[in-house]
Amino acid sequence: MNRDLRRDLYAVAVAALLVTAAAVAGIAVKRDKDVLHVGWPPLYANWLPHTGPGTPAAITVAVAVVVYGPPLAARLPWRALPWACWAAAMAWTFSLALVDGWHRGVARRLTTRYEYLQVIDRFDDIPRALRDFTGHILLGSPDHWPPHVAGHPPGATLTFVLLDRAGLGGGAWAGVLVIAVGATAAAAVLVTVRALADESLARRAAPFLVLAPAAVWAGTSADGYFAAVAAWAVAFLALAVTGHRPRTTALASGLLLGLTVHLSYGLTLFAVMATAVLLLGSRRLRILPYVCAGLVVVPAAFTLAGFDWWEAYHLLVERYHQGAGGFRPYGYWVWANLACAVLVVGPATVAGLRRTGARLTRWHASPVAERRLGLLLCAALLMLLAADLSGMSKAETERIWLPFTTWLLAAGAFVDRPRAWLTAQATLALLLNHLLLTGW
């Protein structure tokens, strides 16, 4: 065992201790007074060992990616690789979701009393619904919105309203949409890493972007869809600053960034990632006008329709403290959230982040491409830590932070023995999905 691998295992052991501490402390808090409002701390889940129709498929996909993922990622033509990543990520996510069965795992996930599909009929008149949106955020308001509708800008709900208008109504189509679109996040991160670092690192990261425990929550939660939209906004920006059809990709990035902040208030933190991409690019000044032009389109449309983003955000903060966020203890969740993140990204990412830190501390001795990928990963970590310290993400971060944790998976590009680490990733995901009944 070489020194680097030994240090990787030390980092994984420390991460495992963090998860163990969060579980033990969480159980103790629940026994004393259940203010955590989660079933199996630190995760929003319940202990329920089970199998389902997705079990054979999930094992098959896992074995296939472990065995064939690294060589295929190294040999496939570049144009085919993002498509292959998307297909594999979609197969992995669908199979994990189906471990809970079609209805419980996919079709009914977005139809509970907390979710967006509960209010589709209240958007028959979309302009009026947008004008009145802020009037239904607080719990004391008439016909207040369900938690997830109140907790997000209306762009999130409008996604499912428009899907319904297209004739694809109901929980099944909504579940299929968020899984299919969410799986494209793997391709978006891949494109970004190639544009800003190099193709070799992107190819090494590819299997880790696919075979991640994060897929347990990407199927089926709307946050997986949000993660994909944000990831493509960054990917298009990376293409723009590196000279790939700069005007078109810059405009597309701006449009998606504008949509991103109207899907989730917390995704304004992607300003950090966008700044990092601009700093890593060589054409930042030329493309900024196009990014800005695209950026104003979606916010302007919502504003003209009568939705006040800032008013809604301030009301959301109040609503958050009216519910579980008001009694969930910050002193526990500020570090237990990080334990959730460990379970989402898996041991390979922990080891990869350890190696990222080592490369950044040896700045001049590290290859330029590795330093650039390291800075991108630091931006993702900074977003995650800012969300954590804000106190607006107490629990359920295994899904809420998917837009941030998706980027950390690229740290897998730095590890040696990829098949062993991919096996660890798959094993963790399969255990989580089969031993726990997760909320999403």
PLM ranges: what are they?
Residues 210-217, 248-276, 294-300:
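Membrane-interface alpha helices of multi-pass inner-membrane proteins
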Residues 284-289, 354-379, 418:
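Membrane-interface helix-loop-helix junctions at transmembrane boundaries of multi-pass membrane enzymes
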Residues 64-71, 173-196:
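Transmembrane-helix motifs of polytopic, lipid-linked glycan transferases
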Residues 234-243, 247-251, 268-294:
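Perimembrane helix-loop-helix junctions
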